[in-house]
Amino acid sequence: MAKAFSEEEKELIKTKIMETALDLFHDKGTKALSIQELTRRVGIAQGSFYNFWKDKDALVLDVMRYRSKQKLEIVEQRFDESLKDPVGFLTQIIYVNSMDLMKKGEEQPVYSQSFAILSRADLEAENRVGVVYRDFIEKLAAYWKEHGVVKEVDVQGLVNVFTGSFVLFANAVQFDREYFEKIFRIFIENTVSEFIQR
């Protein structure tokens, strides 16, 4: 019988599993990752894994959210830079983040395997790509309003810009390489500006 964990222990174990999964993903990719190896490294019973996730795909989605959240927390420290040009700031964040993910997807199988999971049509709404960015967009919009630099921000529209950027970079091979980055940037800038009223 699996040990019952306190809420504090659950959070610590979940974080440790995700950190360990990140290490293993980079070493082996998602397909080669075994729950047995992961739980052994974390020091919990294999059955305890299922107290946190229903399967490996659910873990992969959480790890991607976890890693994205870490990166976005760093960007939050730069919110003051966005006051002069909110559209330009968010365009640059989406563009740089997306190009980084695209490059990693080309170089590291773990990312392309993770993108495949995120691209499935049967994902529940809370597991779609853009949802990862909702809290970040809400905080950024609140910051802009607090400082009086915007009138309105369509948070859901901006969440969908993140989703659209994912769809485009995941299908970048369909574009002539010399045009992709320009088209990609224009898409992001134009759609971001649609959802921010100054």
Question: Which residues fall in each region the model found?
Answer:
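Hydrophobic alpha-helical connector segments
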Residues: D62, E76-K103, L158-F162
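Solvent-exposed, amphipathic alpha-helical segments
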Residues: K16, T20-K28, I74-R78, V161-A172
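Amphipathic alpha-helical segments used for helix-helix packing
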Residues: F89, D100-L123, N171-Q174
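Helix-turn-helix
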Residues: L24-A58, D62
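Amphipathic alpha-helical packing segments from all-alpha helical-bundle domains
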Residues: K69-E76, R120-H147, Q156-N160, K182
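An amphipathic alpha-helix adjacent to DNA-recognition modules
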Residues: E11-E19, K31-A32, F52-E76, D80, ...
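Hydrophobic/aromatic-rich alpha-helical bundle segments in the mid-to-C-terminal region
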Residues: K145-E189
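Basic, helix-initiating cap at the start of DNA-binding domains
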Residues: M1-K28, Q36-E37, R41
